[in-house]
Structure formats: C-alpha cells, structure tokens
Amino acid sequence: MCKGLAGLPASCLRSAKDMKHRLGFLLQKSDSCEHNSSHNKKDKVVICQRVSQEEVKKWAESLENLISHECGLAAFKAFLKSEYSEENIDFWISCEEYKKIKSPSKLSPKAKKIYNEFISVQATKEVNLDSCTREETSRNMLEPTITCFDEAQKKIFNLMEKDSYRRFLKSRFYLDLVNPSSCGAEKQKGAKSSADCASLVPQCA
C-alpha cells in the first residue's frame, strides 16, 4: 500500500527539500542573468543613438575623456555592471556630485552617506583603498570639507585607469560602438552613422 511522503525516511525528505531549494536558486539566478543581459543590450542601444563614432574613438585616448562624456560614462558603467564591479565608478560619481554641493550644512550628511556606502568596514559597496588612504578619509569625517574625498577618489580613478578601463577598451561594449560594421552594419542599407547602427549592436552580444 502506498504511504506517500509520510512513508519516506527523514533523510530522503531532507534531500528532496535541499534539491528543491537549489533548483529554485538556479532558476532565480538564470532569470537575473537574462534580465542583466537585456539591460546591457538596451544600454548599448541608447549610447549608440546619442554619440558619434568620432567621439567614441576619443574615449580610447584616456579614462578622463571617457567618463567626462555623458555617454562614455554610461557605457563604462554598463560594462562594470556586467562584471558586477560597478562600486568604483559609483564612488567616483558620488564624489563628483559631492564636490558640487553649495550648502555647507549639506556636506556632513552627504559625506557620511558616501563614507558608509563605500569606505567604512561595513560598507555595502566597499571600494579597494589602501589602509593609509582609508584612515585619512576616516579622519576627514570628523569635519567634512568639500575636498575630504579627493585622495580616495584619485586612488580609485588610478585603479580604474590601470585595470577596468583597459578591459573596457577590449570589450564588446566598446568595440561594437567604435566599429559598428563588425555587427554587420555594412549590410544594412542607409547605415551612414553610428546612430544608424544602434539597432544592430544588441544582435552582436
């Protein structure tokens, strides 16, 4: 006579439960990857539509050229997001926004928010700083000024310049923008500019 689940040993029930949990996790991870992939493709389309190839080529000259341009910054951020390492550029952006604050009364709360998010030991998006710079920035939090993150921002910029920026220039995120013909744009009638190639970029990913 069939006893159903009640007749199974406890160890079997635990194994089945563990397997169900693992399958659920894998399905969620798969959905997340597909979602991120879709977002990355859309990001590249928007970027293509808003910038010329001449400008894109300037991005290879320096990291400063890249992130000082709105679309270049968006492209670089999308690339870092695909590598799950966008905390460095997020910190750099936060520092740039911080330096634009005009009201002295707003400096302290904003500084503490940036510190807690990127620099403290329990930071949710901790950036890779050497101990000296981290300690110096921590001391600056006692009396935050408009320049209290300058040294830390400089270190993170140099880190991105030597590492992620070089990878970005070799990635499809950049190569598809600087050379849209590699996506088959030359086969499309009327493809006269990078904007015309926008719809083709996602198909190359």
Swiss-Prot record:
Function: Inhibits signal transduction by increasing the GTPase activity of G protein alpha subunits thereby driving them into their inactive GDP-bound form. Activity on G(z)-alpha is inhibited by phosphorylation of the G-protein. Activity on G(z)-alpha and G(i)-alpha-1 is inhibited by palmitoylation of the G-protein.
Protein name: Regulator of G-protein signaling 4
CDD domains per the UniProt record, alphabetical: RGS_RGS4 (cd08714)
Highest rank taxon of the organism: Eukaryota
RGS domain location: 62-178
GO terms under cellular component: cytoplasm; nucleus; plasma membrane; protein-containing complex
The keyword Glycoprotein is assigned to this record: no
Recorded GO MF terms: calmodulin binding; G-protein alpha-subunit binding; GTPase activator activity; GTPase activity; protein kinase binding
Keywords associated with the record: Lipoprotein, Palmitate, Phosphoprotein, Schizophrenia, Signal transduction inhibitor
Lipidation (S-palmitoyl cysteine): C2, C12, C95
Gene: RGS4
GO annotation terms (biological process): dorsal root ganglion development; G protein-coupled receptor signaling pathway; negative regulation of cell growth involved in cardiac muscle cell development; negative regulation of dopamine receptor signaling pathway; negative regulation of glycine import across plasma membrane; negative regulation of potassium ion transmembrane transport; positive regulation of excitatory postsynaptic potential; positive regulation of heart rate
Tissue: Expressed in brain and heart. Expressed in brain at protein level. Expressed in prefontal and visual cortex. Isoform 4 and isoform 5 are expressed ubiquitously. Isoform 1, isoform 2 and isoform 3 are not expressed in the cerebellum.
Record-linked InterPro entries: RGS, RGS_RGS4, RGS_sf, RGS_subdom1/3, RGS_subdomain_2
Upper classification of the organism: Eukaryota, Metazoa, Chordata, Craniata, Vertebrata
Post-translational modification: Palmitoylated on Cys-2 and/or Cys-12. Phosphorylated by cyclic GMP-dependent protein kinase.
Presence of the UniProt keyword Lipoprotein in the record: yes
Involvement in disorder: Schizophrenia: A complex, multifactorial psychotic disorder or group of disorders characterized by disturbances in the form and content of thought (e.g. delusions, hallucinations), in mood (e.g. inappropriate affect), in sense of self and relationship to the external world (e.g. loss of ego boundaries, withdrawal), and in behavior (e.g bizarre or apparently purposeless behavior). Although it affects emotions, it is distinguished from mood disorders in which such disturbances are primary.
